[in-house]
Amino acid sequence: MKIPLILVTIAIILLMVPTESDAFDLGGLIKGVVDLFGRRSLKNRDYFDYMQDPSLSNADLRELEELLEDY
């Protein structure tokens, strides 16, 4: 009874390793499939929420642009 328990434990550990690493990026795979089909409803449009921030002035935006131009 010990051998099947050990084998199941090893199998679970070996299945957990690729899902926790950055090499197995399930989010990137899903994004690639979504971009392949090009459906607008499935694309991430959250970045539009940050385009109009009333607390930022033109001077602030210019300063941010200067800081981030090398990225």
From Swiss-Prot:
GO cellular component terms, semicolon-separated: extracellular region
Signal sequence coordinates: 1-23
Keywords: Amidation, Antimicrobial, Antiviral protein, Secreted, Signal
Residues with the Phenylalanine amide modification: 37
Main location: secreted
This protein's record includes keyword Secreted: yes
Propeptide stretches in the record: 41-71
Protein family: Belongs to the non-disulfide-bridged peptide (NDBP) superfamily. Short antimicrobial peptide (group 4) family.
Function according to Swiss-Prot or TrEMBL: Antimicrobial peptide.
Additional notes on this entry: Shows a low ability to inhibit hepatitis C virus (HCV) infection in Huh7.5.1 cells.
UniProt protein name: Peptide Ctri10261
